[in-house]
Structures are given as C-alpha cells and as structure tokens.
Amino acid sequence: LNSCIKITKNDLILGMEVDFLLIGQGLAGTVLSHRLIQDGHSVHLIDDGDPNSSSKIAAGLYNPVTGRNLVKTWLADILFEEIERFYHEMERLLDKDLVHSLGIYRPFVSYEEQNEWVAKSADPQFNAFIKQVFTQSRNKGVKDPFGGVLLKSTGYINTLELVNGYSEWLRERNLLTKAVLSEKDLVQTKDGNWQFKEILAKKIVFTNGIQARNNTFFNWIPFIPVKGEILTVKQDYYSSEIINRGVFRIDMGEGIGKVGSTYNNSEVNLCPTDAGKKEILDKLEQLIEKEVIAIKDHQVGIRPGIRDRKPVLGKHPSKDNVYLFGGFGAKGVSLVPYLSKQMVKLMVCGEEPHKEVNINRFFKYI
C-alpha cells in the first residue's frame, strides 16, 4: 500500500476512532482482540464471515506431545499452563461451553514403542503430561494389542462456538464490521493512521490467516496453505477419551465422532475429496473395532501454515503501525493464548517476541 492516497484527518467521515483495527476474526483475531480490550485498548474488527474458515472447521485439539517422533510440542510447559485458564475465561465471558478436558489415548504399534513410553513416563520432562502407560490392551473397542499411553493436559476447544459467540459479543458492542476487505478500502492519513470507511485506527493488525499472503504488506511471508479434511461419522462406539493414532477421533455423543484430518499442500481448495475420505476411513478402521455406519458430514479447511512450521508475530519492516499475527497452522488452539500476550507486549511496549516466531526471520525475503 505504498501508493495509498494521502488524506487529512479533516477529510474523514465522522466516525469511530480506535487504537487497533484487526483484519480477521478467526481464532487469532478473537483472542488477540480480547487481550487488547483487557489491556484497556479500543479495537474494531473486520471479518468476511466465511463459514469455511479454518478456525470454524478445526477440531480444536490441544496436545502437548505431538509429531512423528512424539516429542513435547514447542514451549509446552509454558503454553499448557495458559490454555485451559484462558478458554475458561472465554467461557465465562460468552456463557458458552467451550473447554472439553479429555485424555488422549494413543495405542502403541510395537513393543519397542511401548518400551519407549515406559521410559518416558519416568522422565521429568514428560511425566507431567502422562497419566498412564498401558502395556496390554484395554479392551475398550480400540485396536491396541500392544497397549498405549493415556496423555493428560489434553482435550479440545469448540472453536466454532468460540468464534461465533465472540462475533456476537463484538456485534452487540459495535466492534465488528462484516465485510470483504479490499486493499483500496484501507487509506493511510497524513499523520500515519489508517482509515477503513468511517473507522480511523492508529494501528492495523492482520489476523486473517492464509488471506494475509494476498496483501502487499505481507505477500513475502512464506505461507504454506495446507488443506485438511474432517469427517463426522456414525459408529456404535463411545469413548470418554480422544483416540489418536494416524487420525484423531473425538466423541461427540450418541455414536457420533469427529475424525481427521488429512494434510494436503498440493491441492489447496475447499472441495471435499474421495481420496481424503478414504484416507480417513482407512486409518479409522485400523484404530477402532466398530465399523462406520454412516458419514454425517465431510468438511474442508485451509490451515495457514508457514514454511518453517512456526507462526509469525511482528511489525512490518518499514511501517511502524502495521502488524501480522498468524501462521498458526494446526496448533492455533495451543499457541494463540500465550503468543497473543507476547503480541500485545510488542504492539504496546515494543518488546520483541520469541526469536522463533519473530517476523524478522523473514526479512531476507523482501
């Protein structure tokens, strides 16, 4: 937007003046705006209301032990102190049931893996997140001949309820505009502020997920959009735990389970595929003994991944009042509550975030 039209403040339509204008009200925009309001700042959000946004499709899992090598997720000890505390706070604000604290049961595929987890259970780095290691099948409808590990400090957040509930909360206070933002709608004033229609903002923050790559401020960030498919299935099966091996299965009650997800960065669109459905069902068959009776829903979302698999927090290199808070991929539920606090410190106090997530690691791409 270097060629933006310059106008004077006197030319503005009389309207709302705010400290921060956030572009996008998915999970990132929801949490960051709440942090800013808590800190005493005025905000306004713009969102297109897309029902297929990744925040609305996401399963919302939080799990401290992830990846093929089953390691503690980055900053797990810090992140997981914040997760349930923050989302319980949002439950109280919105009067919604958002937090589902459930153990995650991961079956072993060999005695070698079983032995590894027995050893990990004695490791102080892991035992805070391990509830129990089973060396035999639990005979609960899960295919686990070698036993498995039951993890704690885990569960899922109902992100659809969170985002929609917070959207309503914002609308009641005239803090949300439903609009598809075009760059020509953002006009920089002579004093450096930003105008969107009748709103004048001191700072703007892009919290719009993968769409941030389409604006000229941040089109140099190496976003990697990833297509993920999720099925809602009917089975004669119930579990009070999330089952996770190859795919996750979250029990929604009455024989309904949410199962996913796929990972596809070569065919990035919102079209459900037979290949994605087959992949999920094949992996579910290897996990759960009961067959699928019916497929109730087949959803697709686009995760906003980054090349180095870490999110991006920071200020534009040449515009002091333009920021990016995004790239959370599949771990937004875990990362956003803690990193949103770092983002507020950056925008308000000038404190730089962790180097692993700092936007300056990508300045070489400009």
Regions found by a protein language model. Name each.
Residues 61-140:
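Dinucleotide-binding Rossmann-like beta1-alpha1 core, especially the glycine-rich loop
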Residues 68, 96-106, 131-169, 179, ...:
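Helix-loop-beta segment of a Rossmann-like dinucleotide-binding subdomain
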Residues 297-366:
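C-terminal catalytic lobe of FAD-dependent flavoproteins
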Residues 31-35, 56, 61, 66, ...:
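Active-site substrate-recognition segment that forms the wall
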Residues 20-44:
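N-terminal Rossmann-like FAD-binding beta1-loop-alpha1 element of flavoenzymes
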Residues 154-237, 241-244:
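Predominantly flavin-linked oxidoreductase catalytic cores and closely associated redox partners
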Residues 38-56:
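Glycine-rich FAD pyrophosphate-binding loop
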Residues 71-79, 149-165, 271-275, 334:
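Short beta-strand to alpha-helix junction loop
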